[in-house]
Amino acid sequence: MHLKSVAAAVTVGAAVLVGCESPVPNKRLDLSCAARAEGKTERRVCVDDIVSNMTLEQKVAQMIQGEIRDVTPQDVFEYGLGSVLNGGGAFPQENKYASVQDWVELADAYYSASVDTRGGGSGIPIIWGTDAVHGHNNVMGATLFPHNIGLGATRDPELVSQIIGATAREVKATGIDWIFAPTVAVAKDARWGRTYESFSSDPAIAASFVAPIVTAMQAEGIASTAKHFIGDGGTLRGDDRGDTSMPLDELVAIHGQGYVEAIDQDVMSVMASFNSWYGEKIHGNKGILTDLLRDEMGFEGMVVSDWHGVGEVKGCTNDDCAQAVNAGVDMLMVPTDWKSLYHNTLAQAKSGEIPATRIDQAVRNILTMKIRAGLFNRGLPSSLAAKYQDQIGHPDHRGIAREAVRKSQVLLKNENQRLPLSPSGTYLVAGPGADNIGQQSGGWSVSWQGTGNSNSDFPGGTSILDGIERQVSAAGGRVVRDINADADIDAAVVVFGETPYAEMQGDAYTVAWYDKRGERKLINALVEKGIPVVAVFLTGRPMWINDLLNQSDAFVVSWLPGTEGEGIADVLLRDANDAVQFDFVGTLPMPWPALDVNAADRDMPVDEFAFPIGYGLSVTQAPLWSALSEELIGADNSLDQEVFKGGPRGSWKLFTGDKSDWTVEVTSSIAQSSSGSVVVRAVDRVVQEDSRRFTFAESGGDLSLIYMQSEYPTDLTDLNEAGGALVVEFRVVEQPTATTTLRMDCKYPCSGEVTFTKVLLDAPLGEWTRKAIPTACFADAGLSLEQVNTAFVMATAGDLTVDITEIKLATAPAIRSIVSCADLVNDTALLN
């Protein structure tokens, strides 16, 4: 059904619903004061009056926040829900390419359902929250700015204020009211997968950006959220959702200063953190969420939980956690299980397990935020959004982003003042990141993890290659892409680095950077040819990369610059008259590691540094380079490769196929093969969308398949000699009804195939299982190990439903997980 039809159905169908049993006993409320209340006193009086007249069911409904993939406008009408959100990779109609109008229509549908009182509903407007963490990053065509780590390198809070204003206007264009930002984390261990969401590891630098952000966002009428309270950046080993153990005064001094700034600016909401403090989950810790945040720090706004965060509290589940409410959580972000959460919370409120006073205070906090955000006098979201339709990807916003990009670049090395380059020269521009807007944008870019994207998914954006080529061509110079091109190359600009990731999936065991796409081989070849190398390193954290720092003539830390790649060309190149266009002004927001791990204690962050916070050269500086040690202290795991972890990793891409089309790339949270014989859907194992469910349906005896493929073939010879294996962590939901095979390809038809049916049938139904299939088994079946471009193919002609959370190539799989090649044989007897 089209969204306009959904909205109409909600309104027209209301009269029919009057005679039905509604989950929420309805009571019409007088909300007139909410549209005119100004100042704290008036708001308090108004909110007290509204809450005193609400039913318990209406109150609990206000505390529930579901996700747009699991909440319909009809649900909002029937339950009177307080909020919805779109998580990373969630779109209207589950369409990655949803238009701005699609977003607005869905916002109108939710709003209309929430204020429709003809069935006796409360009429309280719903509020929609979104993770616009570096621009309106879920929306096609939006301006994507540098991630926070890059903004921290600019040391320019005023520029960041402009970025937030632009982001807020793009969010308003889609009818959304609330942004889950700023992240005020102080990242202390770069192994943490959310390091790039932190402005700095220095509490003072990180805090300096907070007040301008909150002020700019709320000045645009968008509710802001300081997150994640508290200690998310201080966990042991940098583990996302791990434990932060330090005295309370130290916790506040290091990880709390951003909240002090946010509270001073009357931030509307705070999000609870996934981490624990001394082993107790923050989501269930009253001492943190109430005693510290409210009583000591003076926060008066609304506390929202993180995605299924309540389910991590001891004794709780995603849909049952009185402890979180009693601890101080006002709104419960439970995307999928919100209905059972509503009923359980209501029962706990009725029994007194959650005191009535606590329920009332939570609802007061929610309604106060809604009044402050202007929801009661704003009307249909489309009425406001219409004024901002030209703001998505507006040229002014892209100009701000381009300025932020060039100011965020940090120059670590510039031998013989190699930079900036004359645009009239001839340059090789190479590396996997050169023409890859997705890689330069990082996580939280269209999709949650930032994977599954191509340049066409960023309309209006500019790759680094495009930016360089545009300026060089305009000055009469030349850009080539092939190292063997028939050209006298003046220098090579090599763009490389981390591939996109977000929380959990970005956690690392070391800060060493391992190339998986031949980057080191490329740079070595350039050095051997005597071609000067300008390295542009795309990264979400400081990393140990000493060998390439030593080899490069110039080394630029580009962070994750977003969609405006020409900002990098602005500092790499002189203007047409050979004058410096823009100098490098970026400085390190975090120290740059001299070691790959902490030499004394691997659980601790690296504590020896090559460059301190604040380091960054200008083009006029050329300090004598002192070679850095290239010795790894930690284990060299460079042969290991993560192929899939909740989604494709590195250069690997996920495809599905059947005889209608073998090459359907999976780029969103739900997809299917051309004929529908394979359906792919994101599911949660532990955290948001950390797994995929593959449902195969029998289709006349024809094969259907899923596979992981890369345009960069990998040589598995050394991994195989080290006893390596293809490791798959999976859960069988429905057992196979026909032979199921696993295959690795060396550019098909070169391949090696084994039968996987017995492994699937032997796996406990509904339980997670990890199995390691030796690469030798595939080699014995015909695989040429030198050029493997497809690491995993699962194929069957029957029914099968299997969840997969991880696929990796590993040198040291757990012995008990290893499958004997003898068990990967004919399965005819097993299926009869």
Model-predicted segments: where are they?
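Short carbohydrate-recognition loop motifs
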Residues: 650, 669-708
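Noncatalytic modules at the cell exterior or secretory-pathway interfaces
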Residues: 780-791
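Activation corresponds to long, low-complexity, non-globular regions
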Residues: 635, 639-673, 815-832
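Buried hydrophobic-core signal for structured, non-transmembrane domains
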Residues: 366, 428, 572, 726-730, ...
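Glycoside hydrolase catalytic-domain context in secreted enzymes
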Residues: 20-651
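Extracellular ligand-binding interfaces
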Residues: 701-782, 796-815
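Gram-negative bacterial Sec-dependent N-terminal signal peptides
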Residues: 1-20
